């Protein structure tokens, strides 16, 4: 490719509404242009990267035995009604009516359609296993689209769905997809972790996220440096304490804490460590009777140590909270506790309030908590003496650095990540709700065991940039760079020798199957170099009259601090030796 025949449209400054590095650099480098909130056009150089990502994904999916198809972007409500997700999906699913007033949606995912295909086409166990995948546009009407392609409304995704005869076979399909994902992210050249994860709204009981490591990542990843343990912080278990609870050493006292409504403020006022305080969080569940009519509200008091944070995913697994919960209103809190948030505690609480203590709190003695009276806290609080043991003890908190690893092989560390892939074992969640069955060898109908596997193709671009950039621009991994090599002739319009040598190298690299661009725009060197550093091409060769006099050219990798002088006779071979394999 010659730059004069290509479309290069770089900007000196990013638009003022660009938030994160990847968004700013993709706009400045001419990869994307904003059309509406969360919706972008991909310019030729951006689409070039997308196609390279898609090629790697498609290659590994095919290698793993998956079969590509395409399902409709527009899907009828009837299929989604079968699983109950027409209502469950909420406002993120964009719904509309056609001219006949029939309900449709722009699909955010395709479990319903692919399950419908399976129940119509896969009649016998002899046709199993099957794994169907597509690479297609999706739409999710995010409440607040942000971070460019990282959290857009329209995006490209690879979604795959496996169908198996039993749990064991489904496990093999899951493992095959997990291995394929590892190969995909290895080939993409990204630093990543596969972490155990919560299954969320999709359901199922086995799940892993593939997280690209980046300081700007939205997700917290918990891992053990001394082992293979890794999990999303939503799932990572805080182990029960081995030490037994200490005996009470203090008397219970009601202590004035005027205007101190947080554990941090109380600890500072009293001159005590934050970890001696207990935080009270009030949740509520809306009860219904057998006819699904409202039947009152149950209030729950969840207790975590003052220096810990509540993990809402873990809270949602408590019996009684699994069907859904919300934070209690101030009115509900006042009715049960007699005061407002900031001074709440478990001592003397109405028996109708269910008390759930985090494992750490259940092991505490002489702790500080709210007195259920404005401007007062209790010190020297002890279980069994000052209040009954909690109704339930559970793992309620987020992991913190230094907690013991659940696999017993060291202490946990935390890093940030960007989720770019997710694999789920679904079981029969969808096949049962849609009555999707096949006949086994005895002629009896059985529900398919299913898995689903997603990769955010366009999200990978943003994640790769968040992980790989510097002050000058993007630093693409070789495998997905828009061009792997750029040849920069200095004095293209003035020197026959420069044009000859630059063209010769360009044609040699092209003949070797190397993805190279020749910058024949006759720009000033500073402009030319700045453009390609911003765009992020990993390898640059500069050919100019000064070097040609000595029979030399300059090579510089995008991460290199300085250029190296290479003899012209060795130049093509040298550049080839620097390129990472992409297959």
Swiss-Prot record:
Q: Does the keyword Aminoacyl-tRNA synthetase apply?
A: yes
Q: Where in the cell is it found?
A: Cytoplasm
One GO BP on record is: prolyl-tRNA aminoacylation
Checking Pfam families in the record gives:
HGTP_anticodon, tRNA-synt_2b, tRNA_edit
Which reaction is this enzyme known to catalyze? tRNA(Pro) + L-proline + ATP = L-prolyl-tRNA(Pro) + AMP + diphosphate
Record-linked InterPro entries: aa-tRNA-synt_IIb, aa-tRNA-synth_II, aa-tRNA-synth_II/BPL/LPL, Anticodon-bd, Anticodon-bd_dom_sf, Pro-tRNA-ligase_IIa, Pro-tRNA-synth_IIa_bac-type, Pro-tRNA-Synthase_IIa_type1
Q: Name one GO molecular function term.
A: aminoacyl-tRNA deacylase activity
PROSITE patterns given for it? AA_TRNA_LIGASE_II
Give the enzyme's EC designation.
Answer: 6.1.1.15
Any one GO CC term of this protein is: cytosol
- Keyword tags: Aminoacyl-tRNA synthetase, ATP-binding, Cytoplasm, Ligase, Nucleotide-binding, Protein biosynthesis
Q: How does it assemble?
A: Homodimer.
What remark about domains does the record contain?
Answer: Consists of three domains: the N-terminal catalytic domain, the editing domain and the C-terminal anticodon-binding domain.
What family is it from?
Belongs to the class-II aminoacyl-tRNA synthetase family. ProS type 1 subfamily.
Q: Which PANTHER family match?
A: MITOCHONDRIAL RIBOSOME PROTEIN L39/PROLYL-TRNA LIGASE FAMILY MEMBER, PROLINE--TRNA LIGASE
What does this protein's UniProt record list under function?
Catalyzes the attachment of proline to tRNA(Pro) in a two-step reaction: proline is first activated by ATP to form Pro-AMP and then transferred to the acceptor end of tRNA(Pro). As ProRS can inadvertently accommodate and process non-cognate amino acids such as alanine and cysteine, to avoid such errors it has two additional distinct editing activities against alanine. One activity is designated as 'pretransfer' editing and involves the tRNA(Pro)-independent hydrolysis of activated Ala-AMP.
Q: What is this protein called?
A: Proline--tRNA ligase
Classification of source organism? Bacteria, Pseudomonadati, Pseudomonadota, Betaproteobacteria, Rhodocyclales
């Amino acid at each position: 490719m010659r730059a004069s025949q290509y479309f290069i449209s770089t900007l000196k400054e990013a638009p003022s509404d660009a938030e994160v590095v990847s968004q700013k650099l993709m706009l400045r480098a001419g990869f994307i242009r904003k059309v509406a909130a969360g919706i972008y056009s991909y310019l030729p150089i951006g689409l070039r990267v997308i196609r390279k990502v898609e090629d790697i994904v498609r290659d590994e999916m095919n290698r793993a035995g998956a079969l590509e198809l395409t399902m409709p972007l527009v899907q009828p409500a009837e299929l989604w009604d079968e699983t109950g997700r027409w209502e469950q999906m909420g406002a993120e699913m964009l719904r509309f009516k056609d001219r006949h007033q029939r309900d449709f949606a722009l699909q955010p995912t395709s479990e319903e359609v692919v399950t419908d295909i399976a129940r119509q086409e896969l009649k016998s166990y002899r046709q199993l296993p099957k794994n169907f995948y597509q690479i297609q546009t999706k739409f999710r009407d995010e409440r607040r689209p942000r971070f460019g392609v990282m959290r857009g409304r329209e995006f490209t995704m690879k979604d795959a769905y496996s169908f198996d005869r039993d749990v064991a076979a489904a496990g093999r399909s899951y493992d095959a997809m997990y291995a394929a994902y590892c190969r995909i992210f290895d080939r993409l050249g990204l630093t990543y972790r596969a972490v155990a994860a919560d299954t969320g709204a999709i359901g199922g009981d086995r799940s892993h996220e593939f997280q690209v490591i980046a300081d700007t990542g939205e997700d917290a990843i918990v891992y053990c440096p001394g082992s293979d343990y890794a999990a999303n912080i939503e799932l990572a278990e805080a182990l029960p304490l081995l030490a037994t609870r200490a005996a009470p050493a203090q008397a219970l006292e009601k202590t004035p804490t005027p205007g101190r409504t947080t554990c941090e403020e109380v600890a500072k006022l009293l001159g005590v460590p934050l970890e001696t305080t207990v935080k009270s969080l009030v949740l509520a569940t809306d009860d219904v009777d057998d006819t699904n009519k409202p039947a009152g509200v149950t209030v729950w008091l969840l207790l975590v140590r003052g220096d810990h944070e509540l993990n809402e995913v873990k809270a949602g697994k408590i019996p009684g909270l699994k069907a859904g919960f919300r934070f209690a209103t101030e009115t509900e809190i006042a009715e049960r506790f007699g005061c407002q948030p900031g001074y709440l505690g478990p001592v003397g609480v109405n028996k109708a309030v269910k008390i759930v203590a985090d494992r750490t709190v259940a092991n505490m003695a002489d702790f500080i908590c709210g007195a259920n009276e404005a401007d007062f806290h209790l010190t020297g609080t002890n279980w069994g003496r000052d209040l009954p043991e909690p109704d339930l003890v559970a793992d309620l908190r987020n992991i913190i650095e230094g907690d013991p690893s659940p696999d017993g092989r060291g202490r946990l560390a935390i890093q940030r990540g960007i989720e770019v892939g997710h694999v789920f074992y679904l079981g029969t969640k969808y096949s049962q709700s849609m009555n999707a069955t096949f006949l086994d060898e005895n002629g009896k109908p059985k529900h398919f065991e299913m898995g689903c596997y997603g990769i955010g193709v366009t999200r990978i671009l943003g994640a790769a940039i968040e992980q790989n950039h510097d002050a000058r621009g993007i630093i693409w991994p070789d495998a997905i760079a828009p061009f792997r090599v750029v040849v920069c002739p200095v004095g293209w319009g003035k020197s026959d020798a420069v044009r000859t040598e630059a063209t010769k190298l360009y044609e040699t690299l092209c003949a070797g199957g190397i993805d190279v661009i020749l910058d024949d725009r006759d720009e000033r060197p500073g402009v030319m170099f700045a453009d390609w550093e911003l765009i992020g091409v990993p390898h640059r060769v500069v050919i100019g009259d000064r070097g040609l006099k000595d029979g030399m050219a300059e090579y510089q990798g995008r991460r290199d601090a300085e250029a190296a002088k290479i003899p012209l006779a060795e130049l093509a071979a040298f550049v080839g030796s620097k390129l990472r394999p992409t297959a």
